[in-house]
């Protein structure tokens, strides 16, 4: 099981990410895409990253907006896995 991060560690790691915010035991970011098909294509790419990492975000799709939420359920909060996947997601944008 991944080790849950402290509040200080979470804040430090959030400083390395752009647009991700903490909401309770999750980090979250909304992406604005140019069209609905491009939003779906983005989600498919996120799915491949998530599957490879064995770590899956909650995904909310609303037309051209995609909101991703990351947490590590079995750790009961945020772990390095969440920040690693957030970084990978940002790299495909």
Swiss-Prot record:
Gene3D superfamilies, per the entry: Transcriptional coactivator/pterin dehydratase
Keywords: Lyase
Family designation: Belongs to the pterin-4-alpha-carbinolamine dehydratase family.
Enzyme Commission no: 4.2.1.96
Reaction equation(s) it catalyzes: (4aS,6R)-4a-hydroxy-L-erythro-5,6,7,8-tetrahydrobiopterin = (6R)-L-erythro-6,7-dihydrobiopterin + H2O
GO biological process: tetrahydrobiopterin biosynthetic process
Gene Ontology MF terms in the entry: 4-alpha-hydroxytetrahydrobiopterin dehydratase activity
Taxonomic superkingdom: Bacteria
Organism of origin: Roseiflexus sp. (strain RS-1)
EC top class named in words: lyase
Entry keyword annotation includes NADP: no
Protein name: Putative pterin-4-alpha-carbinolamine dehydratase
InterPro entries assigned: PCD_sf, Pterin_deHydtase
